[in-house]
């Protein structure tokens, strides 16, 4: 292969490599992409990476082989140019598809009655004159997925709105995976329209889930719900929301320091409720597709749980599609991924920390400040009690 042709093939391959590298670097900077890769869903990413590297490998091989067998080197050089063209087309097409969806026209729909975390919630006065607060939490409705149960999620929201109108419910917290694919405006539009229809006046707050973040979905989440990491005070009850999508991939030293400072600032005789999408303790199963265990999250338990144990009274998460109550290290841990997303299979692993679990049912967790303490009640989507625990100081 002639030196000039080798240089041209190598330059073309380097351009293809640079284009694909830029796309992949952007993708991995986005929230949730590293978690998606670590949890075994990185096949498309690996395919794009291979397509970016292969032309350069072939071009370098062409230069090496060309000294001994010019004809083979020439064929390899031509192959490198063809592969480079395919790689650049793939990078361009993927970029156009992702960016046009993630940063395209906004999802035009009325937003729910969003709570301003900085203003918090004002507790009501109970019959005995003491402060009372009652909120509902659920997670993983997955708008945009055919297998989701639209009737169940609507029933949960409508029940919560009716209780709010009756003066019995103060707020609703959606703990993530609101939509199936976060970068798509269509899913957000339908979700926001449905939430606004079913809960027109109910104060609402949302966390970002791993599906909400797909890929570049953070901009659409922020437009819909605002920040997903905050502290919200409601009299003697304090809510702390953490940005934990697949796990602690994005939980750095700054996040840990912020969490430590928030926990330390709450009086010991008041209530601390921590919210996240990814679970900590949970029963679950082995994912047949990836071989990954969807139960007792080792990374979360190693890196984040020690900060919360014994300091947070209650930690509520989604991600796994169960309703479950667990107790460990002086803290109660709840999973409530039951807002209509396809139920997860019957657990093949039951966490040693599990006290109660429901599989295959949709519902919510109702947390209420009562004179005895903090009442925590799982209900099905019709409001029937399934399990209740009262936390006491």
Could you describe each region identified by the protein language model?
Residues 6-48, 77-78, 90-185, 283:
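N-terminal active-site segment of His-dependent metallophosphoesterases
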Residues 1-3:
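Short, Lys/Arg-rich, polar N-terminal cytosolic tail immediately upstream
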Residues 48-84:
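Cytosolic-side transmembrane helix boundary signature
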Residues 371-376, 380-393:
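Acidic, His/Gly-rich catalytic cores of divalent-metal-dependent hydrolytic chemistry
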Residues 135, 172, 239, 272-273:
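Hydrophobic beta-strand anchors of alpha/beta hydrolase catalytic cores
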Residues 98-129, 183-272, 286-314, 320-370, ...:
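Extended active-site neighborhood of metal-dependent phosphoesterases/phosphodiesterases
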Residues 140, 176-177, 209-210, 277, ...:
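Active-site glycine-centered loops adjacent to acidic/histidine catalytic or metal-binding residues
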Residues 143-150, 248-249, 283, 342-345, ...:
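Short, solvent-exposed loop/turn elements at domain surfaces
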């Amino acid at each position: 292969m002639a030196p000039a042709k080798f240089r041209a093939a190598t330059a073309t391959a380097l351009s293809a490599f640079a284009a694909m590298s830029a796309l992949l670097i952007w993708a991995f900077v986005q929230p949730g992409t590293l978690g998606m890769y670590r949890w075994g869903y990185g096949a498309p990413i690996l395919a794009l990476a291979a397509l970016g590297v292969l032309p350069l490998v072939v071009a370098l091989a062409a230069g090496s082989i060309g000294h001994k067998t010019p004809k083979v080197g020439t064929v390899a050089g031509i192959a490198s140019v063809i592969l480079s063209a395919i790689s650049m087309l793939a990078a361009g097409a993927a970029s156009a598809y992702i960016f046009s969806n993630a940063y395209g026209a906004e999802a035009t729909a009325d937003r729910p009655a969003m709570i301003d975390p900085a203003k918090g919630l004002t507790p009501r006065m109970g019959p005995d004159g003491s402060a009372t607060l009652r909120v509902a939490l659920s997670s993983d409705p997955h708008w945009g997925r055919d297998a989701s149960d639209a009737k169940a999620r609507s029933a949960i929201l409508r029940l919560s709105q009716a209780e709010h109108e009756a003066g019995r419910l103060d707020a609703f917290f959606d703990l993530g995976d609101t939509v199936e694919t976060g970068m798509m405006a269509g899913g957000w539009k339908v979700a926001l329209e449905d939430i606004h229809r079913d809960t027109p006046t109910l104060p609402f707050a949302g966390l970002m889930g791993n599906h909400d973040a797909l890929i570049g979905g953070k901009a659409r989440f922020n437009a819909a719900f605002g920040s997903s990491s905050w502290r919200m005070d409601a009299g003697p009850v304090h809510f702390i929301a953490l940005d934990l999508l697949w796990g602690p991939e994005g939980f750095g030293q700054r996040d840990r320091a912020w969490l430590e400072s928030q926990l330390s600032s709450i009086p010991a005789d008041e209530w601390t409720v921590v919210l996240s999408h990814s679970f900590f303790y949970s029963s679950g199963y082995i994912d047949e597709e990836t071989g990954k265990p969807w139960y007792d999250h080792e990374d979360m338990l190693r890196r984040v749980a020690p900060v919360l144990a014994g300091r947070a009274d209650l930690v509520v998460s989604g991600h796994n599609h169960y309703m479950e109550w667990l107790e460990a290290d002086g803290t109660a841990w709840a999973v409530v991924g039951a807002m209509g997303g396809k139920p997860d299979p019957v657990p093949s692993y039951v966490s040693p920390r599990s006290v109660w679990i429901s599989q295959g049912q949709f519902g919510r967790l109702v947390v209420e400040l009562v004179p005895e303490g903090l009442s925590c009640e799982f209900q099905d989507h019709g409001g029937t009690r399934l399990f209740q625990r009262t936390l006491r100081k």
